[in-house]
């Protein structure tokens, strides 16, 4: 019989101080909550075997599968601006890597027991955070945003102690890699240039193979990470996503969204929104995310200085030149995304101001971010040059002062006259850019309460069904598109560790 996971491991071949070898800790009574069968097929795995007793034991950490080389990776990181020289995987164990139809992917268990980096923690995960990450990562994937994926969620039959006793669970996470900005900081902080070089060479081979042919491969690696992060954060903003804990150890060089602990989506639009209970000063607020991304990338550039050039002045020049490119790349991606949300297929000098004026009006009028843009797509002028009055009223109703929307919409409709194409095509473009469904924060809490307190996973399954098709109307699930009463003000998220 073939192996359950056809592992082809590369990170485990790196020097031993890159990680600590550790096996998952067995649990009492593993039970499968959900297997992502479609993802399993994409990875070249047999979903039926993964759902078998043997498969569930592997997904729970009860059994180490053939070919696995379980390890916990070492890394450092800036956490809320403060540098911590050693963090590492404290509750996650990399089983190995598989090569599927989309390339090489890590298979990692989260909540599978203590590791050398657990720092007195139990290495376990509670059910609520596991279900949250499963849902959010799959919702982000359906939205078309680069992200880690969830292969499976398993309950352990054990309790974990946080503020109270909670049911334990294990998440199987899939990622292009788990190399973080903090991975490079770990070696740079120790003055380990050879370790830094080995990690960079591994990253180039895995994520930027064309960089190996560049005049300066390490500068090309840095350029690639910057380009991916600029595009990623722009995509976050266009769907109202707030990561919540953008520490350097939570930034993947693969350009995937990773570590979903205290994340959330905007309800009412306010760029100062920060949901995380530990982000007391709004460092990682919605509108700060581009600035923080650049700050994190600057820390990566600092770590790479010894590789960029043997001459310190030249190395700094290379780093600064690379970082200078972030702003333009982010702005192009962000404003391109906003244009699509407004139904604009071409670019004009005044477009950023047009979008900015709408966002300002939304903030002043406490309009819902997702519903405003979705309904705007139905309010485009028809063949006769006039919008549907009912569609216009549906947008206006989201604003405290509907006439503020009216004033903005006059300029928008004038701008649309510069565009080719008919109203139907424009409406279709806007529907593809403006989701009807995001993972509403109050629905997350309802789902977690049902699962944790009543062992009822029906709300979890329903949300998975709805969020798999975020750009479709789905009339039977219309209530899941609605914001909470009060626009979500006062909502708080917790990292779950």
Swiss-Prot record:
A GO MF label: magnesium ion binding
One Pfam family per UniProt: SelO
Region of interest: Disordered: 477-497
Residues where ATP binds: 88, 90-91, 110, 122-123, 173, 180, 259
Keywords for this protein: ATP-binding, Magnesium, Manganese, Metal-binding, Nucleotide-binding, Nucleotidyltransferase, Transferase
Catalytic residues as annotated in Swiss-Prot or TrEMBL: 249
Catalytic activity, EC: 2.7.7.-, 2.7.7.108
Cofactors that this protein relies on: Mg(2+); Mn(2+)
Top-rank taxon, per record: Bacteria
Catalytic activity: L-seryl-[protein] + ATP = 3-O-(5'-adenylyl)-L-seryl-[protein] + diphosphate; L-threonyl-[protein] + ATP = 3-O-(5'-adenylyl)-L-threonyl-[protein] + diphosphate; L-tyrosyl-[protein] + ATP = O-(5'-adenylyl)-L-tyrosyl-[protein] + diphosphate; L-histidyl-[protein] + UTP = N(tele)-(5'-uridylyl)-L-histidyl-[protein] + diphosphate
Keyword hit for Methyltransferase: no
Binding site for Mg(2+): 250, 259
Enzyme class: transferase
NCBIfam families named in the record: PRK00029.1 (NF000658)
Protein family according to the UniProt entry: Belongs to the SELO family.
PANTHER family recorded: PROTEIN ADENYLYLTRANSFERASE SELO, MITOCHONDRIAL (PTHR32057:SF14)
Function comment: Nucleotidyltransferase involved in the post-translational modification of proteins. It can catalyze the addition of adenosine monophosphate (AMP) or uridine monophosphate (UMP) to a protein, resulting in modifications known as AMPylation and UMPylation.
Name of the protein in its database record: Protein nucleotidyltransferase YdiU
Species whose genome carries this gene: Methylorubrum extorquens (strain PA1)
